[in-house]
Structure formats: structure tokens, C-alpha cells
């Protein structure tokens, strides 16, 4: 399962965690993804969707 929303394409973002002493360590921010049953092209499918798309009503749940 890819860490990407199937509706909007939101995915992992990479960057640095910066400590108080200004040391940079690599880290990643993950989207809040949920597996939901939704109606896609008239059929019920299980898709990976971010919670932003769920709250905004871009997904018709089955």
C-alpha cells in the first residue's frame, strides 16, 4: 500500500528535524490516510484516502 491519497495525491513529505542545538536529522511527515470502502465509477472499492478528502466530501462512502 503506497502512502498516497488516491483522490488528491497527497503523500509523504521529507525534511529535517532541527534540534535546539541546530542539528539537522532527516525525517518524514506522513499523511493521515484511511482505508475506506467507497463508490468509484459505480462500483464499491476499498481505497486509501486522506482525512482531508473524507471531511470535505470528495469521497462517496459505500
From Swiss-Prot:
Pfam families: Ribosomal_L28. Signal peptide: none annotated. GO terms for molecular function: structural constituent of ribosome. It comes from the Bacteria. Keywords: Ribonucleoprotein, Ribosomal protein. Transmembrane segments: none annotated. Coiled coil: none annotated. The keyword Zinc-finger does not apply. Disulfide bonds: none annotated. One of its GO terms (biological process) is translation. One of its GO terms (cellular component) is ribonucleoprotein complex. PANTHER family: 50S RIBOSOMAL PROTEIN L28, LARGE RIBOSOMAL SUBUNIT PROTEIN BL28A. HAMAP family: Ribosomal_bL28. NCBIfam families: L28 (TIGR00009). Belongs to the bacterial ribosomal protein bL28 family. This is Large ribosomal subunit protein bL28.
